[in-house]
């Protein structure tokens, strides 16, 4: 096919986040002579947007990145005009897939009126932040299931949160679990030894977490848990992959807890799979999640995982996951970590694939959908 059909993904940005990573996993699987992805992102100042984590790869794969002004509620009318102007100028998209559901009720109907054949609202998360921003998100999501041609959700929990239980019960929402490149994360004993030696952590109890430094991920509780572990195990270390606005505050909290020398702030990594190999246990004490891809990645790496009981059970592809409340003392998590610290790591690739979490098999379904 000389002119591939073009699919536009609408997101807040293309930094290293869960939805972004899953879309890129899918993008790499596409025959780009047949299907091309483009991205519509948001920035505070359109002409001053800084390159993000996936910019370079998107452009290398043949995709385009377009920018809208960030939605602030007070700029509702100017935001609508910007969306209208964009779709008036861009008639090339066969599918517009909105992963940023907070304003999908605005941009998807506009895209449809502009002639886009298929619009999709895709729920990628469950729960919203507290305060005015969360209230605004809930307001603009009202009736979203009726404003898109198709509705997808990464889990039942995410679907109910974004589209409502009535839409779910009516069968208006298709559940498509967040799939990963399983082979990339499969347990590798040799790589594990190399990474632990490289990090100077051979013989240590290495705990790990991957996620943006923001409210949802509950880093303060995570650090309290690790501090409790350190009281029992002087050989404990914590690897934190990710970046975000709350990182400086968490670095300061480490100093206050006396654990700064045991915590590694590693930032955004293109080789996250190597760090999973170095870990002994994976921790995810989030306040809310849709279906966390990082939990799927950790299971693919054969890691025992201790996660918040707010995380959907649909993310449990193996018997490696333990759910705990984040309402109680951090010491409860610490004791569970110590109890599970010694186990035999195994190859779980077959289990992940059997559970439908491998992107290579999921890609064919998307291909058929995009081509219509």
Spans of model-derived segments:
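Short His-centered aromatic/hydrophobic patch
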Residues: 98-104, 123
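N-terminal strand-loop element at the rim of the active site
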Residues: 3-5, 9-78, 86, 172, ...
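A conserved mid-protein helix/loop that constitutes part of the nucleotide-sugar donor-binding site
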Residues: 20-25, 205, 209-228, 245-252
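Nucleotide-activated donor-binding/catalytic signature segment of Leloir-type glycosyltransferases, i.e.
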Residues: 251-267
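Aromatic "clamp/platform" in nucleotide-sugar-dependent glycosyltransferases that forms part
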Residues: 268, 287
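A short helix/loop element that forms part of the nucleotide-sugar donor recognition site in Leloir-type
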Residues: 83, 186-200
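A short, active-site helix/loop in glycosyltransferases that binds the activated sugar's phosphate group
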Residues: 148-186
């Amino acid at each position: 096919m000389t002119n591939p059909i073009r699919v536009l993904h609408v997101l807040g940005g293309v930094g290293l986040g869960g939805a972004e990573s899953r879309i890129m996993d899918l993008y790499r699987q596409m025959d780009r002579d047949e299907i091309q992805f483009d991205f519509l992102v948001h920035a505070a100042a359109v002409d001053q947007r800084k390159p993000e984590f996936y910019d370079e790869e998107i452009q290398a794969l043949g995709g385009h990145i377009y920018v809208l002004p960030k939605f602030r509620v007070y700029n509702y009318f100017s935001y609508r005009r910007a969306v209208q102007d964009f779709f008036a100028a861009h008639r090339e998209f066969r599918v517009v897939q909105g992963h940023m559901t907070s304003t999908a009720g605005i941009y998807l109907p506009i895209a449809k009126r502009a002639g886009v054949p298929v619009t999709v609202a895709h729920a990628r998360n469950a729960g919203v932040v507290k305060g005015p921003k969360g209230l605004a998100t809930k307001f603009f999501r009202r009736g979203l299931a009726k404003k898109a041609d198709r509705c997808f959700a990464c889990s039942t929990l995410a679907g109910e949160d974004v589209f409502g239980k009535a839409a779910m019960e009516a069968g208006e929402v298709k559940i498509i679990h967040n799939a990963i490149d399983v082979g990339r994360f499969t347990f590798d004993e040799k790589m594990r030894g190399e990474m632990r030696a490289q990090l100077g952590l051979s013989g240590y109890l290495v705990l790990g977490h991957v996620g943006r430094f923001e409210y949802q991920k509950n880093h303060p509780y995570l650090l309290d848990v690790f501090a409790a572990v350190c009281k029992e195990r002087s050989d404990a270390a914590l690897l934190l992959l990710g970046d975000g606005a709350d990182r400086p505050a968490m670095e300061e909290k480490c100093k206050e807890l006396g654990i700064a020398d045991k915590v590694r702030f590693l930032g955004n990594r293109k080789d996250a799979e190597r760090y999973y190999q170095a870990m002994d246990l994976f921790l995810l004490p989030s306040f809310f999640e849709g279906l966390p891809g990082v939990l799927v990645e950790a299971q693919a790496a054969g890691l025992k995982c201790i996660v918040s009981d707010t995380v959907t059970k649909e993310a449990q592809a193996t018997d490696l996951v333990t759910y705990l409340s984040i309402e109680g003392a951090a010491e409860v998590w610490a004791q569970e970590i110590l109890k599970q610290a010694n186990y035999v790591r195994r190859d779980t690739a077959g289990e992940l694939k059997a559970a439908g979490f491998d992107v290579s098999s999921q890609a064919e379904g998307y291909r058929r959908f995009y081509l219509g």
